[in-house]
Amino acid sequence: MELSDSDRPVSFGSTSSSASSRDSHGSFGSRMTLVSNSHMGLFNQDKEVGAIKLELIPARPFSSSELQRDNPATGQQNADEGSERPPRAQWRVDSNGAPKTIADSATSPKLLYVDRVVQEILETERTYVQDLKSIVEDYLDCIRDQTKLPLGTEERSALFGNIQDIYHFNSELLQDLENCENDPVAIAECFVSKSEEFHIYTQYCTNYPRSVAVLTECMRNKILAKFFRERQETLKHSLPLGSYLLKPVQRILKYHLLLHEIENHLDKDTEGYDVVLDAIDTMQRVAWHINDMKRKHEHAVRLQEIQSLLTNWKGPDLTSYGELVLEGTFRIQRAKNERTLFLFDKLLLITKKRDDTFTYKAHILCGNLMLVEVIPKEPLSFSVFHYKNPKLQHTVQAKSQQDKRLWVLHLKRLILENHAAKIPAKAKQAILEMDAIHHPGFCYSPEGGTKALFGSKEGSAPYRLRRKSEPSSRSHKVLKTSETAQDIQKVSREEGSPQLSSARPSPAQRNSQPSSSTMISVLRAGGALRNIWTDHQIRQALFPSRRSPQENEDDEDDYQMFVPSFSSSDLNSTRLCEDSTSSRPCSWHMGQMESTETSSSGHRIVRRASSAGESNTCPPEIGTSDRTRELQNSPKTEGQEEMTPFGSSIELTIDDIDHVYDNISYEDLKLMVAKREEAESTPSKSARDSVRPKSTPELAFTKRQAGHSKGSLYAQTDGTLSGGEASSQSTHELQAVEENIYDTIGLPDPPSLGFKCSSLKRAKRSTFLGLEADFVCCDSLRPFVSQDSLQLSEDEAPYHQATPDHGYLSLLYDSPSGNLSMPHKPVSDKLSEEVDEIWNDLENYIKKNEDKARDRLLAAFPVSKDDVPDRLHAESTPELSRDVGRSVSTLSLPESQALLTPVKSRAGRASRANCPFEEDLISKEGSFMSLNRLSLASEMPLMDNPYDLANSGLSQTDPENPDLGMEATDKTKSRVFMMARQYSQKIKKANQLLKVKSLELEQPPASQHQKSMHKDLAAILEEKKQGGPAIGARIAEYSQLYDQIVFRESPLKIQKDGWASPQESSLLRSVSPSQVHHGSGDWLLHSTYSNGELADFCLPPEQDLRSRYPTFEINTKSTPRQLSAACSVPSLQTSDPLPGSVQRCSVVVSQPNKENWCQDHLYNSLGRKGISAKSQPYHRSQSSSSVLINKSMDSINYPSDVGKQQLLSLHRSSRCESHQDLLPDIADSHQQGTEKLSDLTLQDSQKVVVVNRNLPLNAQIATQNYFSNFKETDGDEDDYVEIKSEEDESELELSHNRRRKSDSKFVDADFSDNVCSGNTLHSLNSPRTPKKPVNSKLGLSPYLTPYNDSDKLNDYLWRGPSPNQQNIVQSLREKFQCLSSSSFA
């Protein structure tokens, strides 16, 4: 006879489930009582915290004879008598290993308790095996015998699984346990020896949900339900079959708990104690594995259910996106109804629940997913969006902080796991473990995945959590950062989970390499350490380049992305840096604060930190000195242990977690600065590109093309970049049309070509410092660059008295807040002085700048230099200009054609006499700093390999100041600050776009007739939106909107003869940073503003123009084909070109894409050989408000080679005239050609703008010219934009066609006259002949004039759409659609 359920001992540690308590009897039985320990002679000494008390015994103690099932009568009789079971001679092992009986150890309650635990294991195992036998023999075999039951073989297999295998295995295990004679060490050895065989439980547990489903179906069948009820009554089971089928699942998850009880009460000195620990590890791993497999199975079932309920989904089967990780219902901003989010391994699916179905709304692949964790004033919200479309953000409001943290943690894990870059597993683990420190409930386990700890023994979790199991007996320790790394590493080794704990790890964890432990210790040991995901700025620094899959990068370089950039000398054994040839900015921000001294710049560099990230701009000398101090200040360790990089002894406890979601604080800034100072590259490290932070919450994805073997200083990068930042990293995968996120102007990473110091030229530079210097020095950017960012405070020293050695870097970091602090001021003082300003609301920042009248000008408003305030010149000192001259040639040479916007260096105007030059070929009179770029470029032969080119550029870096050393790099600051300044520039740009108001206050009486000034559409709409959404939303909306609306072109400017004076070195300002650039179409292509305006070209006086032309408007009747890739103003980056894209010619037309004749010729004129790349139409609307000619080639029909020859002639003549301007002795020889060339036109009203020498116009005439883009009205119709009818242009076609023939006749002859008289170019008639002109370095003409007399007022009118051009109505509709779609709020 079988034991009834009430007669078997059940462990208090066993888990009950709803299935096992469905009947009236609980899992303990209806007659069970809990016997106190005191009844067993046990007192308080064993009542330790956390111990599982196993003193559950039957209400009637039964004798051992009851277990003799072969004598049921005797067993029943003994049970009725209630006789006590005689104690067996139980052999114990004392601390000395000598066996003693239980009688001898009666005085040892500890041993008695261990003995009770051993008895518990044996008794419950017997009962468990008995239950298994009942399932197999009394249910499974009986069903097999009953052929009439409507239960097929498949259903039977699903119902019982591999229960027979488990029964046989546990029968053997029970036999082995009984042979151990109650020796706890021997019992533990049994589990270790059979560890491999426990895998059969995985199959059973995975099948269990299906078993429950089959059983449920069976109970709906009357025949089967009756059969199961009868079997239960026959067997006198108090529990139904379902409860018995659950027992294997419960049992396998309980073994490690029982073994824990042995370990907790076994003497640590006992021989074989380690075996018990191994047994615990073994059974824990089994339990984890089973839980994970069971969870995956449950999620697969749920996934299929979701798939069946999902409507409107056009994508592939959801199973292709991996396992379901989380699901939940949230409120979404701007959505009336709640949304149900499903997070898969590779996909975030956003749906709307309707009745029982889910309607698809949106999805984002985890590889493209961006997460904004901190949203101001919304502590429960977070945002997710596609990195290519940051304006379409899904702001999700969680129901609790716990819910938010759960989602955020899993999102971050999946972002890391799905990132295109090769992120080492240890780096991922370190990042997630770092997060786990701040979230006690979550851990990252080596098995890969964030685990949720909810304390339940089965790893159960709330429903929405797709749980991953982890042992629950984990407790935190306080970790002091003053501990040596050895202690930290020992702590790390003793962890069973990523959390700091006192428990032992699994063998796999104990065997983890030191690099993992040291990295973990480094990550953990920061007192002021914060959540690396605190807000999106910090998170951005974590993500390296998104690489094209075909690129093969060095693993060590990838590894650098995610590890703190310690010197390899510090990590010689742990190998955090596999190779010291590359250093990446630290992915998280912490570092040793130097209490003794600071090596940061003496300026007050407090900037609006729009994004996080360090700039490894210090030379190796500084990094070495910092590391030397670090070694001196840090506790010394022995052997292979890593030096702890933290000198403070701040404690990190779980209490520090409470505010991890706050915004980055003052301490974080200090840590970032210190980290940047510490994380310097060694001299051999190449200036590879680095993680680019963003001012928008997006990642900068870089495609790095340079290899370690090249030691290349060149990195071709293009694509998404931060708004207002003058540096960009992206990949060719971002060439899609949708890449116009905020700015798609890409800038190459800077080779250190202009560094005058050998140490600096070796330093890794992660920001575009060269262009940064131009930023500081520019005045043409003044309308859209923050005054606080660019101007030196007038109440302080007018100059920056920097030596030539550090002038360059001090230039880069001149204080954006207009203050220069003294070099001796500590970092903390400088930071604290304006840390509030850094984090002030954007509104206050913008209001502060609104008062400046000049700020209301649009970014590319054409004003001659006569109108520039004089104080700009006073601020530019000889040393400043000298440093700029050194820095202007630090720009990299992009490989493909790209358009770089120019930077007009206001410092260059201060004194041309002080401009340093890298070539002696430039005459004294023509010496302008910007020629450094040209001279550097034209001296270098154009190499097919951009890396060789960069290397040759490196070889040209002048070692004349080799001792720049520490002082120079003391001027460097964290890239956080540089990003802040650029963010302020983006804000300023948006300010202009939003705040363009009537300029009549700045108009003298002569222009009173222009009272009704016209604004662009962005400004018009903004005035209607005043008081609308937050400035951040307006910035997001208008930064792109401004560029996507295509206006009629603004007039060009013509410079006067006196341009060469020190106060007016316009040549400098008209040179683009990419003048060296070997892939672009022409030297003249770069002479444009960032929004496409010709850089230095002023219109002649209005009277002169009116006498010559009825109108001087440039007609661009065709709008660009695509407005989707608009470039915003202040980014100053080269656009990511479509393959071989045709760049916009500011002076001529878009270069033909049929052949590469144009660029070949252009390189020939510079003495270089061209790159034979087929040009493709460049459909991007590059700052459309001032695009001269941006037609794709299909709208430019070259009827014959004559048209091409005209273009060639124009290029040559323009260059010739520019040379004549540069050389006074031939300054007058080009006059004759100007008049003729001005008549040259091309098909489709594509006007060739040619050189002319006229006086610049002042601000008022420039204003009139600019606003003549819009039809003047005499009322208050500022919002009115006229659309001309198609008939208005019909007459113009005839006149243009008539002019075409006569234009082409004299162009070449006139050009040859210019060439001969100028003596500057040699035999350029053949576009393929690579002749090097004498003054090729000087070939730059800042003078353009509008086209000729024959272009009448009618040219200003809109033309009817040609067959391959869009209708103007469609064009306007696109603009307004773009307007409405870009609205964030």
Swiss-Prot record:
Skewed-composition ranges (Low complexity): 11-30
Stored InterPro entries: DBL_dom_sf, DH_dom, PH-like_dom_sf, PH_domain, PH_PLEKHG1_G2_G3, SOS1_NGEF_PH
Listed GO MF terms: guanyl-nucleotide exchange factor activity; small GTPase binding
Keywords on record: Guanine-nucleotide releasing factor, Phosphoprotein
SUPFAM superfamilies: DBL homology domain (DH-domain), PH domain-like
SMART domains, alphabetized: PH (SM00233), RhoGEF (SM00325)
GO cellular component, one term: nucleoplasm
Domain spans labelled DH: 113-293
Keyword Ligase: no
GO terms classed as biological process: regulation of small GTPase mediated signal transduction
Gene3D superfamilies for the chain: Dbl homology (DH) domain, Pleckstrin-homology domain (PH domain)/Phosphotyrosine-binding domain (PTB)
Chain intervals with Polar residues compositional bias: 63-80, 498-518, 570-585, 593-602, 714-732, 1318-1328
Name under which the protein is recorded: Pleckstrin homology domain-containing family G member 1
Organism, scientific name: Homo sapiens
Gene name in the database record: PLEKHG1
